[in-house]
From Swiss-Prot:
InterPro entries: Ta0600-like_sf, UPF0147. This is UPF0147 protein Mlab_1361. Coiled coil: none annotated. Belongs to the UPF0147 family. NCBIfam families: PRK04330.1. It comes from Methanocorpusculum labreanum (strain ATCC 43576 / DSM 4855 / Z). It holds the Pfam family UPF0147.
Length: 103
């Protein structure tokens, strides 16, 4: 089985999407952008900040951080006050977190 090495350019950073640490960094950057976006409701920005802190906690394993963050993001994804562009970002973030191995 051939494994593809995908890279992703995000705000000038070259990220290796096969590396879970780089995927966590990408998620943190996405969450930071959401927390700074004034068009997103305050409660969703607060969850983005809390999720960012969970992903930055290096005391836990990468898989546990990803699973915890995914749970938090999933909880807020059904918020009826969320604008469409924010919901799209949430789905992209969830897809990235799901690609990180939990074990």
């Amino acid at each position: 089985m051939r494994r593809f090495n995908m890279s992703y350019r995000f705000w000038g950073w070259e990220l290796n999407m096969a590396n879970p640490e780089d995927m966590i960094k990408q998620c943190i950057m996405m969450l930071h952008a959401m927390s700074e976006d004034s068009t997103i409701p305050r409660n969703i920005r607060r969850v983005a900040d809390e999720t960012m802190k969970v992903l930055q906690d290096e005391k836990k394993t990468i898989g546990l951080r990803a699973a915890s963050a995914l749970s938090m993001i999933d909880e807020v994804s059904n918020d009826s006050n969320m604008p469409i562009h924010a919901r799209t970002r949430i789905w992209e973030l969830a897809s990235t977190l799901e690609a990180i191995p939990f074990d």
